[in-house]
C-alpha cells in the first residue's frame, strides 16, 4: 500500500455557499438542501433509518465512494444515535462505515462546510477532532465510545479496491455510491468499481446513487445487482437503487486466511502487558467477555514496565509493508492515546516531538531514504542541526528527521490504567497465574497453572506473553527471539533539564519526567538473553553510546549513571521488525497441507488453485506478539486488528500488509517459493521459569 502523501482537495465556494471541487468542477452536495438530499438519496434509498430496527446483527456495515465533506456519514451517525436512544434493546449496536476519498479536505474546509448544518454540529466536531493527515491508505477512527467505526481510505478508489483483503468480501450491507457526477469524474465509474461492489456486498445488501446514467445501471446489473429507477431528489427526475440477490464469488489468498473466533463470550487473555490490556478493551468494545491471566502479582512487570518510552513511527523509505504498517500504527496510536486522555485516563506523557539524528554515514543514509517521501510536515520533516537544536533545547550536533506528533509516555502508568479500565468494563483478572500448559479438550482450552491452582477452561484463548510466546506446544516453532534491554534512569541537571524533545541516535534520551525528575537513556540489546539482573557494563554502555554519537558537544557529559538506577526488561523480537497478530498457525499441518503449494499455484489449473484449503490454525487460539521495542507504537493497532478479526469484521490495512503481520508468514513465503521450511529452535525457547 502506497503511504505517500496524497493531494488534498482544492475548493471554491459558489454563490449559494456550496463547496465546489476545483479538481472535478462539481459541487459536493445539492445547492437546494444537501442534508435533505443525503436523506433522500442515500439513507432512504437504502431503506434507512427504517432498516436499523430489523437488522439481524450487532453491526451494520456501510461503504461509500467519495467521503467529501462527510455529510452522508454525519447524517447516518445522527440517525443511528437517535435510533439507539429510542431502541436501546435493539440487536443493532454498532455501525462500521468504510469510505474512499481521493482528495481529502483540509480540516478548515470541513469546518466551513459543516457550519451549514448546526443540527450535525456535535457529530461534526468529533469527526474533525480525529481527522487524519493526508496519507494514503486506511485511517481507522473510533467514535462514540467505539459504537462507530470509520475507515477512511485515502486514495483513488480504483487503485485501492484491488489491494483490499478478504475480510471485506461479502460484508457490506449498504453502499452509498456517491462521488462526483459520471460526466465530471468518469474514471471512478467503471466495471472494476461495480464488480468490487458486488464482491464486497453480502446477499441482500443494497446500494443507492444519485445518478441514473445508463452505463452505470448496466454496469451494476452486469456485476450482479438488481437495479431499479426511482424518483430523484428535488428537480432530478430519476436515481438508481438496487439489491444484490445472491453472494458473488470472491477470489481469496487462503494461505493467509484470517478466521474469526467462533465464540467471543468466553475469551481468556494470557499476559499482563500493554497489548494484553489494549486487546481486552478492543474486544470489550464489541461486547466480548474477557478473563485475563497474568503470571506476575500486578500488570506491566515485563517489557511494558518502563518509566518512559518513545513514541514515533518506524520508516525505511521503501514504501513497503513495514513502512505502511508503522505509518498507520503511529497515527492510530496517537488518536487512541488522545482519546484515553480525554476520557480522564491518566498516564505520564509529553507529546514533545521526537528527533532522529543522522549521527554517522549509515544513519544519514537511512534518514535520506526516509525523506525521499515528501511526508506532510505534521508527520515527518527533514531538519538541519540548527533547527533540531532549537526545538530540542540543546545542541543536537547533527541533522536529522523530526516527528512533531511523537513524544514519550510512561508504559507502566498506561498499562495499569488500561487494566483498571478493562476491569471497570467487566474483565476478570487473575494475577500470579503462570500458565504451564495449554491443551484442547472437548472444544475448549484447558489452562493449567501452578500445582496449587485449579485448571481453567475457556472457549477462546489469546496468547500475549511477550518473549515467552514460544514456550507452548502450539507456538513452539514461531521464529521469535528474546532480547534483553536495560534502560538507565539518570537524575536531571540544570543543563539536561533544558532537553525538550526525545533524541534518538544509536540509543535514545528522553526529556526529564516532571513526576520523578529523571531521564531515561537506553537501551541495551542482548539477543537471546532473558535475565533481568542489573548489569554495570550495560549501564555504562548506555552512556557511552550517547557520547560516541554526539562527540562534538559537551552537554552529554552531564549524563550520570553512577547511582546505578535502571530497569531491565525482555522484548519479543522478530527479524523483519513486524508484529505477529492473528490465529496461531498449526506448524505441522501447514507444512503437510502446503507441501506442493508452489506447484499448485504455478502449474495447477484454475479449479485446483480454487480448491486450495485455508491455512491450518489451532482452533480458537489467537496470538499477538513480536512487538519488539516499538510496542507503544504498534500495540493499539494490532489489538484493534485482532479484535476485528475475531469478530469477523473488515480489517484496517491492505492485504499485503496484513499478510506481513500473519504469524505463518515466514513458512508461507518459503512454501510459495517451493523452498523447504527448516525446523529451528528460536532463542526464546529457553524457559524463563
From Swiss-Prot:
Which InterPro entries does UniProt cross-reference here?
Answer: FAD-dep_OxRdtase, FAD/NAD-bd_sf, MnmC-like_methylTransf, SAM-dependent_MTases_sf, tRNA_MAMT_biosynth_bifunc_MnmC, tRNA_MNMC2, tRNA_S-uridine_synth_MnmC_C
Domain of life from the UniProt record: Bacteria
Q: Where in the cell is it found?
A: Cytoplasm
Q: Which family does it belong to?
A: In the N-terminal section; belongs to the methyltransferase superfamily. tRNA (mnm(5)s(2)U34)-methyltransferase family.
Q: Which UniProt keywords apply?
A: Cytoplasm, FAD, Flavoprotein, Methyltransferase, Multifunctional enzyme, Oxidoreductase, S-adenosyl-L-methionine, Transferase, tRNA processing
**What would be one Gene Ontology cellular-component term for the protein?**
cytoplasm
Q: What is its main location?
A: cytoplasm
| Cofactor(s) required, per the database record | FAD
| Originating species | Yersinia pseudotuberculosis serotype O:1b (strain IP 31758)
The cross-references to HAMAP family, in alphabetical order and at most eight, read:
MnmC
EC number(s) stated in the UniProt entry for this protein: 2.1.1.61, 1.5.-.-
| Biological process terms in GO annotation | methylation; tRNA wobble uridine modification
Query: Which GO molecular function terms does the record list?
Result: flavin adenine dinucleotide binding; oxidoreductase activity, acting on the CH-NH group of donors; tRNA (5-methylaminomethyl-2-thiouridylate)(34)-methyltransferase activity
Q: Where is the stretch described as tRNA (mnm(5)s(2)U34)-methyltransferase?
A: 1-245
What reactions does this protein catalyze? 5-aminomethyl-2-thiouridine(34) in tRNA + S-adenosyl-L-methionine = 5-methylaminomethyl-2-thiouridine(34) in tRNA + S-adenosyl-L-homocysteine + H(+)
The name this protein carries in UniProt is: tRNA 5-methylaminomethyl-2-thiouridine biosynthesis bifunctional protein MnmC
Q: Which Gene3D superfamilies match?
A: D-Amino Acid Oxidase, subunit A, domain 2, FAD/NAD(P)-binding domain, Vaccinia Virus protein VP39
Q: What does this protein do?
A: Catalyzes the last two steps in the biosynthesis of 5-methylaminomethyl-2-thiouridine (mnm(5)s(2)U) at the wobble position (U34) in tRNA. Catalyzes the FAD-dependent demodification of cmnm(5)s(2)U34 to nm(5)s(2)U34, followed by the transfer of a methyl group from S-adenosyl-L-methionine to nm(5)s(2)U34, to form mnm(5)s(2)U34.
Renumbered residue ranges of the record's region FAD-dependent cmnm(5)s(2)U34 oxidoreductase: 270-689
Amino acid at each position: 500500500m502506497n503511504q505517500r502523501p496524497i493531494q488534498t482537495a482544492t475548493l471554491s465556494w459558489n454563490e449559494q455557499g456550496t463547496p465546489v471541487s476545483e479538481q472535478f468542477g462539481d459541487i459536493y452536495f445539492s445547492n437546494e438542501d444537501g442534508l435533505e438530499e443525503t436523506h433522500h438519496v442515500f439513507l432512504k434509498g437504502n431503506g434507512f433509518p427504517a432498516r436499523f430496527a430489523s437488522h439481524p446483527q450487532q453491526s451494520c456495515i456501510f461503504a461509500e465512494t467519495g467521503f467529501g465533506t462527510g455529510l452522508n456519514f454525519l447524517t447516518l451517525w445522527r440517525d443511528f444515535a437517535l435510533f439507539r436512544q429510542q431502541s436501546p434493546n435493539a440487536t443493532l449496536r454498532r455501525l462500521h462505515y468504510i469510505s474512499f476519498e481521493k482528495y481529502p479536505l483540509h480540516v478548515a474546509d470541513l469546518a466551513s462546510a459543516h457550519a451549514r448544518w448546526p443540527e450535525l454540529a456535535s457529530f461534526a466536531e468529533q469527526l474533525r477532532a480525529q481527522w487524519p493527515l493526508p496519507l494514503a491508505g486506511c485511517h481507522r477512527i473510533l467514535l462514540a465510545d467505539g459504537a462507530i467505526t470509520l475507515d477512511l481510505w485515502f486514495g483513488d478508489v480504483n487503485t485501492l479496491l484491488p489491494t483490499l483483503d478478504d475480510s471485506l468480501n461479502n460484508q457490506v450491507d449498504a453502499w452509498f455510491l456517491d462521488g462526483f457526477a459520471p460526466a465530471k469524474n468518469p474514471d471512478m465509474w467503471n466495471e472494476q468499481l461495480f464488480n468490487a461492489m458486488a464482491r464486497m456486498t453480502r446477499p441482500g445488501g443494497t446500494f443507492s446513487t444519485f445518478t441514473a446514467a445508463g452505463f452505470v445501471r448496466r454496469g451494476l446489473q452486469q456485476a450482479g445487482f438488481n437495479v431499479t429507477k426511482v424518483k430523484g431528489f428535488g428537480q432530478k427526475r430519476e436515481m438508481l437503487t438496487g439489491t444484490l440477490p445472491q453472494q458473488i464469488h470472491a477470489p481469496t489468498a487462503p494461505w493467509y486466511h484470517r478466521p474469526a473466533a467462533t465464540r467471543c463470550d468466553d475469551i481468556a487473555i494470557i499476559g499482563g502487558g500493554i497489548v494484553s490490556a489494549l486487546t481486552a478493551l478492543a474486544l470489550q468494545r464489541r461486547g466480548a467477555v474477557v478473563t485475563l491471566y497474568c503470571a506476575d502479582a500486578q500488570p506491566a512487570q515485563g517489557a511494558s514496565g518502563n518509566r518512559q518510552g518513545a513514541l514515533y513511527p518506524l520508516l525505511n523509505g521503501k514504501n513497503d509493508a513495514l513502512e505502511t504498517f508503522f505509518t498507520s500504527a503511529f497515527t492510530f496510536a496517537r488518536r487512541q492515546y488522545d482519546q484515553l486522555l480525554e476520557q480522564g485516563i491518566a498516564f505520564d506523557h509529553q507529546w514533545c516531538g521526537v528527533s532522529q539524528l543522522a549521527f554517522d554515514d549509515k544513519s544519514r543514509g537511512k534518514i535520506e531514504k526516509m525523506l525521499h517521501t515528501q511526508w506532510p510536515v505534521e508527520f515527518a520533516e527533514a531538519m538541519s542541526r540548527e533547527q533540531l537544536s532549537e526545538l530540542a533545547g540543546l545542541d543536537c550536533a547533527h541533522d536529522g528527521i523530526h516527528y512533531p506528533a511523537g513524544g514519550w509516555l510512561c508504559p507502566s502508568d498506561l498499562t495499569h490504567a488500561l487494566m483498571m479500565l478493562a476491569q471497570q468494563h467487566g474483565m476478570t483478572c487473575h494475577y500470579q497465574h503462570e500458565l504451564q500448559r495449554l491443551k484442547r479438550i472437548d472444544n475448549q482450552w484447558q489452562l493449567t497453572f501452578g500445582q496449587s491452582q485449579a485448571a481453567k477452561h475457556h472457549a477462546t484463548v489469546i496468547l500475549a506473553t511477550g518473549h515467552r510466546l514460544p514456550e507452548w506446544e502450539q507456538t513452539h516453532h514461531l521464529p521469535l527471539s528474546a532480547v534483553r534491554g536495560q534502560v538507565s534512569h539518570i537524575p536531571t541537571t540544570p543543563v539536561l533539564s533544558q532537553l525538550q524533545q526525545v533524541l534518538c541516535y544509536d540509543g535514545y534520551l528522553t526529556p526529564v519526567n516532571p513526576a520523578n525528575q529523571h531521564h531515561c537513556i537506553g537501551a541495551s540489546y542482548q539477543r537471546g538473553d532473558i535475565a533481568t539482573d542489573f548489569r554495570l557494563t550495560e549501564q555504562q554502555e548506555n552512556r557511552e553510546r550517547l557520547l560516541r554519537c554526539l562527540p562534538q558537544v559537551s552537554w552529554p557529559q552531564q549524563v550520570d549513571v553512577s547511582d546505578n538506577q535502571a530497569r531491565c526488561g525482555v522484548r519479543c523480537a522478530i527479524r523483519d521488525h513486524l508484529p505477529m497478530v492473528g490465529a496461531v498457525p498449526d506448524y505441522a499441518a501447514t507444512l503437510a497441507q502446503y507441501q506442493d503449494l508452489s506447484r499448485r499455484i504455478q502449474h495447477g489449473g484454475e479449479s485446483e488453485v480454487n480448491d486450495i484449503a485455508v491455512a491450518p490454525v489451532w482452533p480458537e487460539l489467537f496470538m499477538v506478539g513480536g512487538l519488539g521495542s516499538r510496542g507503544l507504537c504498534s500495540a493499539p493497532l494490532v489489538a484493534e486488528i485482532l479484535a476485528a478479526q475475531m469478530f469477523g469484521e473488515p480489517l484496517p490495512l491492505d492485504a499485503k500488509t496484513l499478510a506481513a503481520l500473519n504469524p505463518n508468514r515466514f513458512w508461507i513465503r518459503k512454501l510459495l517459493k517451493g523452498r523447504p521450511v527448516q525446523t529451528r529452535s528460536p532463542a526464546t525457547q529457553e524457559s524463563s521459569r
